[in-house]
Amino acid sequence: MNWFFKKKKEELEHTNDLHKEYIELSYEQPQVLFKHSHKCGTSTWVLREFKQMLDSVDCSFDFVLINVFDKRSLSNELARVLEIPHQSPQVLVLKNGKVVDHASHGDILQLNVTQLLC
């Protein structure tokens, strides 16, 4: 599993390019996009539990943590392009250029990540 947290500010200037990058990378391996609010207790709790779930997955994928306060434009652009209304916390699983599943809040912990990613 590859973990991507924050990219350098200059790499994030072109939000359109960044969301396209994640979609393109999903053709190589699944992309797990986690929209997180560090100011929300529920988001922090779900992120911690979800990371534990991902640790048990035995296949290759990228995990991208998107801080919705710092990267609001990226979050909004993903919602627009993927046609999934913005939530936080929210997980979007991309494979082959498409969203294969998504969930928000406590429903994130109900995702069958092994089936989705492997």
Predicted regions and their residues:
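Local sequence-structure signature of Cys/Sec-based thiol-disulfide redox active-site neighborhoods
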Residues: 21-57
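Short loop/turn motifs at secondary-structure junctions and domain boundaries
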Residues: 82-85
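Thiol-based oxidoreductase modules, predominantly thioredoxin-like and allied folds used
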Residues: 35, 59-75
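Short cysteine/histidine-rich metal-coordination sites, predominantly Zn2+-binding motifs
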Residues: 55-61, 112-113
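Non-catalytic, surface beta->alpha helical segment in thiol-disulfide oxidoreductase systems
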Residues: 87, 92-118
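Short, basic/aromatic recognition patches
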Residues: 76-80
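N-terminal leader/targeting and pre-domain segments
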Residues: 1-30
